[in-house]
Amino acid sequence: MKIVYIANIRFPTERAHGAQIAKTCESFVQNGSKVSLWVPRRHTNISEDPVSFYGLSARFPVQRLFTIDSVAWGRWGFFLESVLFAVSVFLRARRTKADVFYCRDEMVVAILCLFGAPIVWESHTGAWGLVGSFAARRVRRMVVISHGLKTFYVEKGIAAPSILVAPDGVDLDAFKARSSKESARTRLGLPLDAKVALYVGGIGSEKGTDVVFTAAELLPREMTMVIIGEGGEKLETLRERFPHVLFVGARPYRELADNLAAADVLVLPSTAQNIVSARFTSPLKLFAYMASQVPIVASDVPSIREILDDETAFWFRADDPADLASVIRRIFDERERAAQKGLHASQKVHYYAWNVRAKKIIDFLSTDFS
C-alpha cells in the first residue's frame, strides 16, 4: 500500500505529536507499506536528522511543501499558514498516485475532498467546526485515538463502522536495554537518595500540571517532584515560580526510556476541566510510562480509564493536588503493591506497540481501498 502521510507541523519538532507521526510512518514502513511524509516548509531549531532525533530504524522520504511560516503571528497567522499549506498539498496531490492520503489536519482533509482523493483522517481532538464537520462527513474512513472520540463523532452522525479506534503507542525496543535508576539520575543531575515522582511532557493548565506543582508543596522533604519537558526562557520562569519542583528541562525523545528509569513514581495529571484531556486524549507518555514498569499515579478521567485499570495504576481525583500528594505518599508506603501494578502495566502495554497499531490501521484501510 502506498501511503502519503500529511501533517501540518514543524518537522522534526520536540513536541509529542512529532514523535507520534514519525513512529507511525516508521511502523507503516515496517508493515510493508511505501510511505512519504508531507510537511510544510517551516523553520525549526532542530538541525538533527529525523531518523536520529526520533531514534527511527526505518527511513521514509520527507517532502517539504510551500507555505508562509506565519504561525508565530497568532491565530490568524496560523490560519494563513494552514490554508497555504493545504493548497500546496492539493496541488501536489493531484499529481501524485497513492492508495491513501493519510491526514492529521481537517483543513487539508477538506481541500483534498474536493477532488475525490482516497482520504483517511486521523483525528485527535474532536474537531467539529465548519471545516471539521465538512471533512468528517466526506472522508471514507476515520482513525481516532480513543473510544471517547469515536462516540463524539458517532453522536454527530458519522457512521460507526467507518471509524477505527487506534490509541497511541510506544516503541518497546527502546525499553529493552534502558539505564539503571542510578545512571539515569546521575545523567539528569537528580539526587541519588531522593524519592522521585516524575512528570514528562508539556506544561500548562490543559495538561494538568498546575495540580502537580501544588501537590509538590504537600510532599515530605525526602520526596522530590521532577519535571522533564520545557526549555529556554520558560524554564527559568518556572524555576523561579516553583522552587519546590526540580525542572530538568527539555530532553530529546530518544532519551525517553532512559529518563523514565530515574523515577520511583510516574505522574499522569490529566485535567477533567478540558474535554480533550478528559474524554479524547491518548497521551504518548502514558504508554511509555507503562513500558517503563515504574508505578503510575494517574488522574481518574475516562480517557485514561480506557487504557489503565485498577491492576495497572494508582488513581487520584482529577484536579485535586491534595489527593495526588496523598496517593504518591501511599505508593512509597506500599512498595510491593506498587511494583506489582508496574509489572502488570508493562505486560499490558504490548498491545499498544507502534507496529501493532500500524498493522491494525493498514488492515482497516485495506478493506476500503484494496
Q: Model segments located where?
A:
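Conserved acidic donor-binding segment of nucleotide-sugar-dependent glycosyltransferases
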Residues: 310, 314-321, 330-335
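A short, well-ordered alpha-helix in the C-terminal region of glycosyltransferases
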Residues: 186, 330, 337-351
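Acidic donor-binding loop of glycosyltransferase active sites
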Residues: 260-279, 294
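Carbohydrate-associated surface elements
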Residues: 148, 169
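Nucleotide-activated donor-binding/catalytic signature segment of Leloir-type glycosyltransferases, i.e.
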Residues: 235-260, 265
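N-terminal strand-loop element at the rim of the active site
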Residues: 7-15, 27, 31-84, 92, ...
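Conserved donor-binding/catalytic core segment of Leloir-type glycosyltransferases
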Residues: 4-6, 191-207, 213-217, 226
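Short hydrophobic beta-strand element within catalytic cores of glycosyltransferases
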Residues: 265-268, 288-291, 295-298, 305
